[in-house]
């Protein structure tokens, strides 16, 4: 994990560190299902358990507590649920960073996609994300690169996504889901910019 570049502190130095990062807990996760829509809501907490020192180039964590509130839904356009669209909004609030006066601004992230299901196991479509920093970063000792352009960052991304469900039991009650996503970023303001390639592996065991 390379955290030489982190928000809101931007560093041009390089450094790699290997080990456990910050802890993420989701003590509240609620879901509702209807014939043509699924809804989910949760509260998540990021804890600063990864090693962090202000200005270091080998940090494994971000050195701050973060609270996450999220609400999302998937809407199905036919009875067989083969055509669907989704959107998930998450709001993040952050504490001051460890041993520092720096506080990262509050973030709003919206992500989702539009897709279709083929042969019950393969999903293909387009994914997107939108992210805005709604309040300015604050604190002492910010580098000159950003000290006059604090906060109000934004990033947008759009690209293809493919996922495949592989059954681990005959009745499909246990699944392994492989997901591939590639996003082109655009509309970036006061932030680093680059395309995103992501793979994920999810297990459903009940």
Task: Please name every model-derived segment.
Residues 1-104, 149-153, 203-206:
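Outer-membrane pore/translocation modules
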Residues 98-206:
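Outer membrane beta-barrel transmembrane domains
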């Amino acid at each position: 994990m390379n955290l030489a570049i982190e928000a809101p502190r931007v560093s041009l130095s390089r450094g790699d560190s290997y080990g456990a990062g910050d802890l993420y807990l989701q003590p509240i996760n609620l879901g509702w299902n209807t014939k043509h829509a699924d809804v989910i809501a949760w509260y998540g907490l990021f804890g600063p358990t990864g090693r962090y020192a202000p200005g270091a180039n080998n940090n494994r964590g971000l050195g701050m507590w973060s609270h996450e509130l999220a609400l999302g839904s998937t809407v199905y356009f036919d009875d067989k649920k083969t055509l669907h669209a989704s959107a998930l909004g998450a709001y993040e609030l952050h504490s001051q960073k460890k041993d520092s006066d720096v506080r990262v601004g509050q973030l709003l992230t919206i992500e989702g996609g539009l897709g279709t299901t083929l042969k019950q196991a393969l999903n293909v479509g387009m994914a997107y994300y939108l992210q805005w920093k709604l309040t300015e970063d604050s604190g002492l000792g910010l580098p000159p690169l950003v000290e006059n352009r604090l906060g109000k960052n934004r990033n947008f991304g759009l690209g293809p996504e493919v996922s495949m469900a592989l059954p681990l039991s005959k009745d499909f009650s246990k699944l392994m889901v492989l997901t591939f996503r590639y996003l082109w970023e655009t509309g970036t303001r006061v932030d680093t910019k680059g395309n995103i390639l992501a793979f994920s592996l999810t297990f459903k065991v009940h």
